[in-house]
Amino acid sequence: MIRHLVLFKLNDGVGRDEPRVLAGVEAFRALGGQIEDLRFWECAWNISDRPIAYDFAINSAVDDADALKRYLEHPAHQAGVALWREFATWVIADYEF
């Protein structure tokens, strides 16, 4: 199994309640039911007020590297990425477990 983690940081001046952000969140929340290769899927807003914290997180799992590739290339995932690219940056980590 491969764990796929993503941490998002909203760009300066961007708020969680902006329509484009809400659309991005909904697009990612829906992925768990849209992409068959996902074995585990959760995403949520950060609840910590620590200055080093990121704003939004995705925690997911797939069977193997091929499944991860299919997930990353899936049109629904690509559509969500296109939305988030407009208002955030992110870091990722993928590891076997």
From Swiss-Prot:
Quote the Pfam families the UniProt record gives. Dabb (PF07876)
Residue intervals passing through the bilayer: none
Family annotation (InterPro entries): Dabb, Dimeric_a/b-barrel
Output the PANTHER family linked to this UniProt entry: BLL2683 PROTEIN, STRESS-RESPONSE A_B BARREL DOMAIN-CONTAINING PROTEIN
Name of this protein? Uncharacterized protein SCO4036
Could you tell me which residue ranges the Stress-response A/B barrel domain spans? 2-95
